[in-house]
Design a protein with these regions (language model features):
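Glycan-recognition surfaces
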Residues: 92, 96-135, 181-237
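Aromatic-lined carbohydrate-binding/catalytic grooves of carbohydrate-active enzymes
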Residues: 2-159
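Charged helix-capping and loop-helix junction motifs
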Residues: 165-171
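Conserved protein kinase catalytic core
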Residues: 160-161, 192
Length: 237
């Protein structure tokens, strides 16, 4: 069972040790049912802040020490932890925010992304690939060590950062897999070859039916045991 522990807007609603407490409670109430917990807003000031600085562990929610404690103690309760990141946008507070990586429209204006807090600006993912993206994953691994299970890459696949096609996605997934982490993604159709979990496929009531997942019976027959990528049996479809 997947669920989310979210921090947002500098409010620290779910500090790392509170998330651990929740894991213990759910383990008790479900008689040891396994858990997949996505930490949404693990860094900077919470969700959708500080993007591209993956190793910036949120201080308000416990910092690196508490995060490592969560990772270590969650194992006892059958919980697999992942983090929610973005490889398509950046924000002014990130130390990796710079003019060269920002994507522009044909008229020279910036290509803007999400804007519910600071205004996000889309990046040029090809430039990012060639200028330090892998090193940022490695920095995160150095801080956390072993034990993190997966990386969920938000919005990748919609093209807002340029080429999000098959080759670019394979490279991104390999960078993540190299650190010992599974690769997960948002769209039901996104990263089918590499991703083991797609949000829109698994969240039955979220989004429209055209993005709900992979409906190939042949592909599912071959790979059903490897991933959660398939269109759900949900009557509204």
């Amino acid at each position: 069972a997947y669920r989310i522990a979210m921090n947002f807007g500098s409010q620290a609603q779910n500090p790392f040790l509170m998330t651990l407490d929740g894991i213990k409670k759910i383990n008790l109430h479900t008689d040891g049912l396994g858990q997949g917990v996505l930490l949404k807003g693990y860094g900077s000031e919470g969700h959708d802040s500080g993007h591209l600085n993956y190793a910036d562990i949120g201080k308000r929610i416990g910092g690196v020490e508490d995060f490592k404690t969560l990772i270590e103690k969650a194992k006892k309760y059958g919980a697999h932890l992942g983090i929610h990141v973005n490889a398509s946008e950046t924000y002014p507070e990130s130390k990796y925010f710079n003019e060269k990586i920002l994507r522009k429209n044909p008229d020279g204006s910036y290509s803007y992304g999400w804007n519910w807090l600071d205004q996000g600006i889309n990046i040029d993912t090809a430039y990012d690939l060639a200028h330090g993206r892998l090193a940022r994953w490695e920095d995160l691994k150095k801080k956390l060590g072993e034990g993190l299970d997966f990386i969920y890459v938000d919005v990748w696949g919609n093209g807002q950062s340029g080429d999000n096609g098959a080759w670019a996605t394979h490279v991104l997934a390999k960078e993540i897999n190299k650190q010992g982490w599974r690769f997960a993604i948002e769209w039901g159709h996104g990263g089918e070859y590499d991703s083991t979990f797609q949000h829109w496929a698994a969240d039955l009531t979220y989004g429209g039916y055209t993005n709900k997942g992979i409906n190939s019976a042949i592909t599912r027959f071959i790979r059903n045991h490897q991933k959660d990528s398939w269109v759900g049996d949900y009557r509204s479809y």
